[in-house]
């Protein structure tokens, strides 16, 4: 349904139905050619005004001191001539045209006007412009704007009057309506520095005179000469109209002022000049305007280009430049004078304090009173000098010490290397010790080198004891020899070589003993063959005695040997113990056999003889509560108890060994 409705609406729009005459609207004025021409004309004028504003802003950036101001009379005549015509046809067709006819200026005419200072002096700022093609221009004026401007001008006109009454140069030390004594003292100059201040003031006569001249000029009128300048950009229809606003009346920078003044002077040589007298109060009012009113003046094609008249700001900026140039010098001079005054004061204070101290010491000495301790000032003054001189002296002394140390180390290294070479060659010990002693006598600091102690260790022969080498190592540590790790490695190497040589010597001695035994056996055989019965009997007697001694030693029971240790170290005993199970069994059999008192286990155990001897000496309280007997015959002493024999598996190997030994 929606698609069909859209299609129906589209067809209705393509083929509109005819409308009756009663429902048709009257034709608008937009379809009329006259109205279209009028709209085109208005659009052209609007675009022209927009185009003229932008070039004027560029022109103000290039030269801000070129401005043009017309008098109050001219403005009033223009307001009388203005005619307002309004035609209101419909809401869509609203037209308002304003025409302004002013007196045209001729090419070589010189304008001169006096602007009087009053409450309702100026209502608008007029700008001159030239046009060749358009016979007239239309512009809109709003009376409300004029009313606001008049009120603002009245408010700003009262401020310059109040400022003129107040003296511009303030009193020395004036701050927030009061005179401060500290500020006066800070600017007051000392007599010792007055000569310098006079010389500086003489150097700046021209700059100060210029500033004073600018201030001494009358505040009512100022004469200014300015050359006429053409617009920066040209259009095919008309030349741009120059405008003035609040932003352009701000003080320009110093560079732009110099450049613009030079440019104006060069252009003034070939262009006519215009002398205009402008009242100063008028310019102050114009500088505070917020909404400028632009007026366009008709001009013919034969007229000269628009003239721009420079305002009072040029003179004001010149005077401000002179002031700016004078102020830095004054401030610099003031700084110098303050610094000089502070130095002079500090010097005077030091002198006075020293004199007072001297007088005090004289008075005390006269009275017989001496200082208990010296003053701190003397100590504090002496210390910095010593500190300042010490670094220089210490630097050169350290340099000399380093040179001496380098020479000593070179000499010591050379002699020690020679000693090591002699040791390797096998030179005698006395000669090497003599050279080392001479070195220590000449250079005592040689003991701090490890190479000296290494030589002493190398001199020690291989057969010497290890204690001598260790003592040398201890002496080197006490002397502070560096690097000690090198000596440690060398001592370890020497000790390892010594141990290896000792092992080799032991093997050689054993071999020597082994060679001696066969020699003795051979000698014994020779003696037996030669028939020496006495010696043989003696030898046999000696052997028999030795054998008898060995038998006695083995048969001695007190000696503990690995073979007899097991027999003498432990004892087999029978432990008698009871358990709750046995007690219950005894109660069951109590009725059958009442003769049995108790039923106990009899277990063979192995006890240490040493522990058994010690426990036998203990009191009865500390002994084992379960009795043990050494044989079965001692069981009768226990009374009418019944015993149950329980074998011990740990003792089976022991019994087996004993049985085997008995059988053998």
UniProtKB/Swiss-Prot annotation:
Bias-annotated ranges (Basic residues): 366-375
Record localization: Cytoplasm, Cytoskeleton; Cytoplasm, Cytoskeleton, Spindle; Cytoplasm, Cytoskeleton, Spindle pole
Region of interest (Disordered), residue spans: 1-38, 254-273, 283-328, 366-393, 512-545
One of the GO biological process terms: mitotic cytokinesis
Annotated stretches, region: Association with alpha- and beta-tubulin: 160-319
UniProt cross-references to Pfam families, sorted A to Z: CKAP2_C (PF15297)
Keywords assigned by UniProt, alphabetized: Apoptosis, Cell cycle, Cytoplasm, Cytoskeleton, Microtubule, Phosphoprotein
Chief place of localization: cytoplasm
Signal peptide: none
Record-listed Phosphothreonine modification sites: 561, 579
Family: Belongs to the CKAP2 family.
Function: Possesses microtubule stabilizing properties. Involved in regulating aneuploidy, cell cycling, and cell death in a p53-dependent manner.
Subunit structure: Associates with alpha- and beta-tubulins.
Protein name according to UniProt: Cytoskeleton-associated protein 2
Gene: Ckap2
């Amino acid at each position: 349904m929606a698609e069909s409705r859209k299609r129906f609406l589209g067809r209705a729009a393509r083929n509109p139905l005819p409308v009756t005459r009663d429902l048709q609207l009257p034709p608008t004025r937009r379809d009329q050619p006259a109205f279209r021409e009028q709209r085109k004309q208005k659009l052209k004028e609007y675009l022209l005004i927009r185009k003229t504003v932008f070039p004027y802003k560029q022109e103000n950036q290039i030269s801000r001191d070129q401005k043009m101001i017309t008098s109050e009379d001219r403005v009033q005549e223009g307001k009388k001539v203005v005619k307002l015509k309004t035609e209101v046809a419909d809401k869509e067709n609203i037209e308002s045209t304003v025409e302004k006819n002013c007196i045209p200026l001729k090419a070589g005419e010189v304008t001169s006007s006096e602007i009087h200072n009053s409450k309702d002096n100026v209502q608008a700022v007029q700008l001159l412009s030239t046009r060749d093609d358009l016979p007239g221009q239309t512009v809109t004026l709003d009376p409300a704007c004029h009313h606001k401007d008049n009120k603002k001008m009245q408010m700003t006109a009262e401020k310059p009057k109040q400022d003129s009454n107040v003296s511009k140069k303030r009193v020395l030390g004036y701050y927030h309506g009061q005179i401060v004594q500290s500020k006066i003292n800070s600017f007051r100059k000392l007599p010792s520095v007055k000569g310098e201040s006079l010389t500086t003031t003489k150097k700046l006569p021209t700059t100060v005179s210029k500033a004073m001249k600018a201030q001494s000029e009358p505040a009512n009128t100022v004469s200014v000469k300015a050359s006429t300048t053409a617009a920066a950009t040209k259009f095919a229809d008309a030349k741009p109209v120059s405008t003035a606003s609040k932003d352009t009346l701000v003080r320009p920078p110093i560079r732009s002022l110099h450049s613009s003044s030079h440019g104006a002077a060069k252009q003034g040589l070939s262009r006519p000049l215009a002398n205009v007298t402008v009242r100063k109060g008028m310019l102050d009012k114009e500088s505070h305007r917020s909404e400028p009113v632009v007026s366009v003046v008709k001009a013919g094609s034969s007229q000269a280009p628009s003239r721009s008249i420079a305002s009072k700001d040029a003179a004001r900026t010149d005077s401000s430049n002179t002031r700016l140039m004078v102020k830095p010098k004054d401030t610099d001079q003031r700084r110098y004078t303050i610094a000089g005054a502070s130095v002079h004061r500090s010097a005077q204070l030091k002198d006075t304090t020293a004199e007072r101290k001297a007088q005090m010491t004289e008075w005390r000495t006269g009275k017989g009173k001496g200082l208990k301790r010296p003053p701190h000032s003397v100590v504090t003054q002496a210390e910095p000098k010593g500190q300042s001189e010490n670094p220089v002296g210490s630097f050169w002394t350290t340099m000399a010490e380093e040179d001496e140390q380098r020479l000593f180390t070179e000499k010591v290294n050379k002699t020690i290397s020679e000693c090591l070479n002699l040791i390797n060659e096998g030179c005698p010990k006395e000669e090497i010790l003599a050279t080392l002693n001479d070195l220590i006598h000449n250079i005592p600091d040689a003991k701090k080198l490890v190479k000296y102690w290494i030589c002493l260790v190398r001199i020690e022969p291989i057969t010497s004891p290890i204690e001598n080498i260790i003592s040398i190592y201890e002496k080197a540590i006490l002397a502070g020899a560096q690097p000690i790790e090198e000596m440690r490695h060398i001592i370890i190497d020497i000790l390892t070589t010594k141990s290896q040589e000792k092992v080799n010597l032991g093997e050689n001695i054993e071999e020597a003993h082994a060679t001696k035994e066969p020699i003795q056996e051979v000698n014994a055989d020779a003696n037996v063959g030669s028939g020496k019965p006495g010696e043989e009997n003696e030898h046999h007697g000696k052997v028999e005695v030795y054998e008898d001694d060995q038998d006695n030693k083995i048969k001695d029971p007190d000696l503990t040997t690995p073979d007899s240790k097991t027999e003498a170290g432990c004892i087999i005993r029978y432990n008698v113990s009871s358990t709750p199970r046995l007690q219950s069994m005894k109660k069951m059999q109590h009725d059958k056999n009442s003769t049995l008192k108790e039923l106990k286990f009899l277990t063979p155990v192995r006890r240490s003889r040493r522990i058994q001897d010690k426990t036998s000496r203990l009191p009865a309280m500390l002994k084992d509560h379960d009795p043990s007997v050494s044989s079965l015959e001692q069981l009768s002493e226990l009374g009418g108890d019944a015993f149950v024999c329980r074998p011990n598996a740990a003792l089976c190997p022991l019994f087996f060994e004993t049985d085997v030994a008995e059988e053998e």
